[in-house]
A protein has these predicted regions:
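Signature of Gram-negative chaperone-usher
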Residues: 2-4, 19-280
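Sec-dependent signal peptide hydrophobic core
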Residues: 5-11
Length: 280
């Protein structure tokens, strides 16, 4: 339409000049056109703060654990880092003279309550849960890289504290992860990170190397990602394949040696798994 209007204006100008009998040539540069400019400034993004948690199986949807103890969120902020990790709950077992194997319970999360404009509701610095939108997920870690530049990174996992109750420890206890997948918002452009070990074991051995969960080469891995261990039935991954079995409660296993299971004092035992984003 702009081209049509410009041509019509030129024709009128030529006719006008011809009528006046002018011998001046028509000037291509005239006062009928002027450019404006558009400006935008891009800065590094920010991750962390506790309100950027999302569903590992629906990466665009904000979620919360509803004030429970299912998820630990990142209180600090920066242009890259670990945003959230799920906490393992292996339930209860009775003292016995046999090796104990217990699977972690699924992670219970809730969709975030939305305001009239569709934005997540934040109360006291935390997402407000829609208690009518309960979801069960596998154990997971969420991270993001919104740096300007950077030469890639690794996501690593390591058992940094053995299960302990005061001075009592479950010596030799291990945690096995399986059914690992990488998930992300497919609208993100660029090269994605590579999934590391999909099956691995964490032990208390201080000499053991951290397990590499995911790796991003230089210039890759920008955006937000999830590694999830166990998926709900019906979940469709980025490969387009539907998960037909619910593995949310059968993918992370605690093993306690028989000698320890028979003699450990009763009580609550807590271990620590540290997830680290090692930037290059």
């Amino acid at each position: 339409m702009k081209f049509t209007r410009l041509c019509a204006a030129s024709l009128v100008a030529v006719i006008g000049l011809s009528t006046l009998g002018s011998t001046q040539a028509f000037a291509a540069d005239d006062a009928t056109e002027l450019d404006s400019t558009g400006k935008v400034t891009i800065t590094e993004g920010e991750v962390g703060g506790g309100t950027d948690t999302k569903d590992p199986e629906k990466p665009t949807e904000p979620i919360t654990d509803g004030g429970g103890e299912e998820i630990t969120t990142q209180p600090n902020k920066g242009p890259y880092g670990i945003q959230a990790v799920s906490n393992l709950n292996f339930g209860t077992f009775s003292r016995q003279s046999a090796t104990v194997e217990k699977f972690s319970q699924p992670v219970k999360i809730y969709g975030a309550e939305k305001d009239a404009l569709g934005n997540p509701v934040i109360t006291d610095g935390k997402l407000t849960a829609d208690m009518n939108d309960e979801r069960l997920r596998g154990q997971y870690v969420q991270w993001a890289d919104l740096r300007d530049g950077g030469n890639g990174y690794q996501i690593q996992a390591k058992m940094t504290e053995q299960f302990a109750n005061g001075s009592n420890k479950l010596v030799g206890a291990t945690i096995d992860y399986s059914n690992g997948i990488l998930n992300y918002n497919t609208a993100q452009l660029g090269t994605m990170p590579k999934m590391g070990a999909t099956v691995f074991q964490l032990t208390e051995d201080p000499a053991a190397s951290a397990v590499v969960v995911a790796t991003a080469d230089a210039g890759a891995g920008k955006g937000e990602y999830f590694a999830e261990y166990g998926q709900s039935a019906g979940f469709v991954g980025v490969d387009g394949i539907e998960n037909t079995l619910d593995t949310t409660g059968s993918s992370v296993k605690l093993t306690v040696p028989a000698a320890v299971a028979a003699s450990a004092p009763t009580g609550d035992y807590v271990a620590k798994v540290t997830w680290t984003m090692v930037a290059q």
